[in-house]
Amino acid sequence: MATRGGGPGPGFRHRALRGLLLLCLWLPGSRPGEPAAPSSGVDRLLQDFRRQLQRARPREELEPELLGGPREDCPGAGGTAVYRAVPDTIIRTQDSIAAGASFLRAPGSVRGWRQCVTACCSEPSCSVAVVQLPRGPSVPAPMPAPRCYLFNCTARGRSVCKFAPLRGYRTYTLSRAEDAAGIPPRPDEDKPPVSKAGKDVVLHLPTDGVVLDGRESSDDHAIVLYEWTLQQGDPSSVDMKVPQPGTLRLSRLKEGAYIFQLTVTDSVGQRSSDNVSVTVLPRPYSTGGCSSACSRYHFFCDSGCCIDIALACDGVRQCPDGSDEDFCQNLALDRKLVTHTVATSAQPGAMGLNEGEGDPKLEKSQRATTHNQPATVSHPETRIHSTQKAPESQINPVQPDSNSSGKNQEEGNYDLKSKSGQAGGEHPAPEAGAVLPLALGLAITVLLLLMVTCRLRLVKQKLKKARPITSEESDYLINGMYL
């Protein structure tokens, strides 16, 4: 493609330099014993291209061919394979194996880097040899043998190994003629990436935020782009930031449900998406010690939990639904209604009986007055007068007639019973829990008394049977023996 000035564009020059680099892989390298040939224009062009790439990309991302030295023929390969040495470089084992590379073996009988390269050249699938050099010249003689590691970095027709700079190691990359002449992989061999947005998250307010991590996404080659988008939720209720590729930090979250989508793109443009939900719940209600383990010493809330019975009716709502205080208000209202009903239905003679216990004549006069009063006495007056004590000088005893004395006496007894029953209604009946132990104790006591009585009777009978023989009985028996 040409630029506006008519000259070749940067893309054209980049493709041309790449073609020249592949062409140079076919050129035989100089022998170790031969003098170096004068550099040609192509070599100078390749060196300039190598320097430009080194300035544009960090060292750990460069291919070993661009960082290495001159190419040399593999020993015993007949010119079909060449190797290049890359000093101070080591293979990134985990990343390389994850990308498709494989570890072959570690020869233990090598005495130098040449034997390690020879072992790799003799291995048909070996493409990278890593040599661990001895630690500096300060090591006393004899020098220890270096360690050698062989890898197969070719997968799907391309090199997939990753490298990193590290002193004390040297990497040797092999290029074979059949690899250079191989057919590039077809697009259908490149599998699409697998997107993993992580597990769903549930938060409670207040919260500082959460970090979504999608770096578990994978691809058979490489993922070049991570994209996070909000699919559901109010965008103004959350702040989204990307601290590093593959992650998303959420802050200032408000109550609600959010759905985020992670889309990953591989090196050939294939995409994959995955969703993750973030649920933000409101601040949990403080139950004030409301527990699910309840006993008879607890107050049962309407919501199902319970609190200490001493905390009920203290003016503070410990139950989540406030039933501990509502119950007390209803209980106080019921007590007022019961007291009002009893006081309203009471007759004037009730207070006269309680207040005039010391005077029998007063009791009779009150009973007679009660039965002789008309039925049209108003309740307010009854309630007012029942709370006041009349002086004895104002009370006139009334003697009942002889004909109606028995009837009045029976009615008076009935009134006493009914009034005593009404007075007893104001006090709560004893609980069943107290009556049951009392009845059980009485039954056990009676049973023990019966057992003791039976035991005493048996003992008395045995004593009667075992009483000693009198002198008269003994004489009778002796005389009977001689007769």
Curated annotation (Swiss-Prot):
Gene Ontology CC entries for this record: membrane
Phosphoserine PTM positions:
S474
Q: Which residues are glycosylated?
A: N152, N275, N403
Topological domain (Cytoplasmic) residues are 457-483
Polar residues bias spans: 367-376, 385-407
Q: Does ATP-binding count among this protein's keywords?
A: no
Q: Where in the cell is it found?
A: Membrane
- Specify whether Disulfide bond is a keyword of the entry: yes
Q: Which residues form the PKD domain?
A: 193-287
The residues the entry assigns to the signal sequence are 1-32
Where do the MANSC domain residues begin and end?
Answer: 85-172
- What is one Gene Ontology biological process annotated in the Swiss-Prot or TrEMBL record? multicellular organismal response to stress
Task: Write down the InterPro entries for this protein, in alphabetical order.
Answer: Ig-like_fold (IPR013783), LDL_receptor-like_sf (IPR036055), LDLR_class-A_CS (IPR023415), LDrepeatLR_classA_rpt (IPR002172), MANSC_dom (IPR013980), MANSC_N (IPR011106), PKD_dom_sf (IPR035986)
Residues on the membrane's Extracellular side span 33-433
The SS bond pairs are C294-C306, C301-C319, C313-C328
| TM annotation in the entry | 434-456
Using the UniProt annotation, give all residue ranges assigned to the region (Disordered): 346-428
Q: Where is the LDL-receptor class A domain?
A: 293-329
Q: What is its main location?
A: membrane
What protein name does the entry list?
A: Low-density lipoprotein receptor-related protein 11
Organism, per UniProt?
Mus musculus
Its taxonomic path starts at:
Eukaryota, Metazoa, Chordata, Craniata, Vertebrata
